[in-house]
């Protein structure tokens, strides 16, 4: 747990952000989620999830590209390695399991969905994949420090031959 203090207009705001630093410096950050309210009768009408604020200091590589990808039920994106790019992922709709293979060959499984939002940082040269473990199309928000260009050959497809992806399929 880290506390960040911000002083602005005589206001001191302390926010505790839970950051799990994993092997090879990939990180899992539990994101803030706040209910939103109707302006007239104040009933709850949804929620707001904070993915990133410049003063949080949770993103160490400035994003140059932000995109949303979809993953159909039971389908897998990856596994692959980005040789230059650092990526930050958050499941914004549906259910996704992020599988990260550290440099010692150990697999780490991070479940993410919009009810319990997380931001997963996968640094360059670390293998990862994500699979939709739910019954509806999932959407993943990605922040990347290098913008994608056609034919840049920055991504290497690999296989997780010693990992059972089928356990997440329904």
Where are these regions (language model features)?
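Asparagine-centered strand-capping/turn motif at beta-strand->loop junctions
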Residues: 131-132
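Non-catalytic, conserved peripheral segments adjacent to functional cores
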Residues: 14-119, 135-170
């Amino acid at each position: 747990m880290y506390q960040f203090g911000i002083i602005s207009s005589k206001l001191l705001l302390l926010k505790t952000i839970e950051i799990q630093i994993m092997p090879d410096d990939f990180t899992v950050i539990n994101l803030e989620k706040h209910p939103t309210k109707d302006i007239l009768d104040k009933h709850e009408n949804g929620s707001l999830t904070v993915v990133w604020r410049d003063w949080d200091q949770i993103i160490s590589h400035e994003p140059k590209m932000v995109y949303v990808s979809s993953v159909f039920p039971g389908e897998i994106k990856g596994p692959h390695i980005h040789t230059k790019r650092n990526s930050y992922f958050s499941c914004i709709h549906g259910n996704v399991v992020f599988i990260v293979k550290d440099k010692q060959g150990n697999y780490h499984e991070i479940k993410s969905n919009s009810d319990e939002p997380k931001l997963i940082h996968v640094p360059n040269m670390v293998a990862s994949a994500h699979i939709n473990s739910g019954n509806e199309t999932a959407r993943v928000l990605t922040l990347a420090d290098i913008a994608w260009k056609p034919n840049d050959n920055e991504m290497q497809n690999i296989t997780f031959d010693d990992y059972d992806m089928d356990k997440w399929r329904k």
